[in-house]
Structures are given as structure tokens and as C-alpha cells.
Design a protein with these regions (language model features):
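Enzyme catalytic cores with a strong preference for nitrogen-chemistry domains
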Residues: 1-187
Length: 187
């Protein structure tokens, strides 16, 4: 069963869409395109990934109040790709949906964060939550400056993901509170 579980996690490419209806007025659509890890950040797959997110977000006939994309769903760093991303988001949010997307982002000091960003019905950022518990050797090198491997690269440069300043809750336009845990923080 362990082999089957590994295969399901690593090789299954079945996209997942889950809709949660608390009542008939508020629909949450959770989208999981199941992009293979070895393709996630390759530029030649970027358009394919975006098309997949877009298609799955629009798949159901009913419009969603909130669409949720997974951690690091968008294959670019925000806000470097802000105009491109906002153009895509505006196409998805035509029915006045909001979007919660996991993404890597830079701040004004060019520090890198793993974040969840809530986009309002106009495609503008309405709130940010940053990851607080990083994965050692996956998102940062512990004690990097004290060891000879301080020049080891995680993301094609010597940049670690930082613990972000934004924590707490996000609020939708309907004043629904969203408590966000990103990946490793759930454990």
C-alpha cells in the first residue's frame, strides 16, 4: 500500500475540484491541478499550468464565491508577475468571485516569502498571510552562515524563503474569516 500511496502522490495527474456549499449563497471551490513537482517551475510548462488553473477554476456551471488555489500554484513570483497575474485573475473572477492563491512573493526589500494572497473581486490583493514554519533544507538552509555549504542553492540562487511578517486571519468581502496554514504548518 505504501508503493500505491507514493504512486498516487507522485505520479497521478488527476486534477481535483471540490466544492463546498455552506448554503446556496456561498460556494467555495477548491482547485488542485496536480502539477508534477519536476515541472512546477520550468518555464516551458508555465502556460500549461496557468491554463490548467484557469480551466479548473471555471469548470463548474455555478459560480463560486471563493476559489482556492494550492500552495505555490502560480509559476512565477509575485509581484514581479503582478500585471500578468492580475490579467489572469480578472478573467477568472468575472462572476465576482474572490481568489485565495498560494504563491511565492518578494517584498520591497526583495526578501522571498511563501504566502497565501486573497484577491478581491477586481483582482487586487486584499490580504496576505505568510508562512511561519519553514521546511528545513527545502525552504531554507539552517545555520547557513555557520557551515561551508552556505553557498548551497535552493532556488537557483542563494536565497532562502523567509518567515513572513503577515500572520493572522484574512477576511472575504462577505466577512468570512480565513485561517491559513501553509504546507508544513499543518503538522
Amino acid at each position: 500500500s505504501g508503493f500505491y500511496g507514493y504512486w498516487c502522490i507522485d505520479y497521478a495527474s488527476v486534477p481535483i475540484i471540490l466544492e463546498l456549499e455552506q448554503n446556496s449563497d456561498y460556494v467555495i471551490r477548491i482547485v488542485q491541478p496536480n502539477i508534477p513537482q519536476n515541472q512546477r517551475w520550468k518555464p516551458e510548462y508555465k502556460d500549461q499550468h496557468i491554463d490548467s488553473l484557469f480551466a479548473l477554476s471555471k469548470l463548474k456551471k455555478t459560480s463560486a464565491s471563493l476559489i482556492i488555489w494550492p500552495e505555490a500554484a502560480y509559476p512565477s513570483i509575485w509581484p514581479n508577475s503582478k500585471k500578468e497575474f492580475n490579467d489572469i485573475v480578472k478573467k477568472i473572477l468575472v462572476n465576482k468571485s474572490e481568489l485565495l492563491s498560494g504563491m511565492l512573493r518578494f517584498d520591497l526589500d526583495k526578501k522571498l516569502y511563501n504566502s497565501a494572497i486573497l484577491f478581491d473581486t477586481n483582482g487586487e490583493s486584499a490580504g496576505i498571510i505568510d508562512k511561519q514554519k519553514r521546511v528545513p533544507f527545502g525552504e531554507y538552509i539552517p545555520l547557513r552562515d555557520n557551515f561551508p555549504f552556505k553557498n548551497l542553492s535552493l532556488f537557483g540562487n542563494k536565497m532562502d524563503i523567509n518567515i513572513g511578517p503577515n500572520k493572522g486571519l484574512l477576511y472575504t468581502k462577505d466577512d468570512i474569516k480565513l485561517g491559513i496554514f501553509i504546507c508544513y504548518e499543518i503538522s
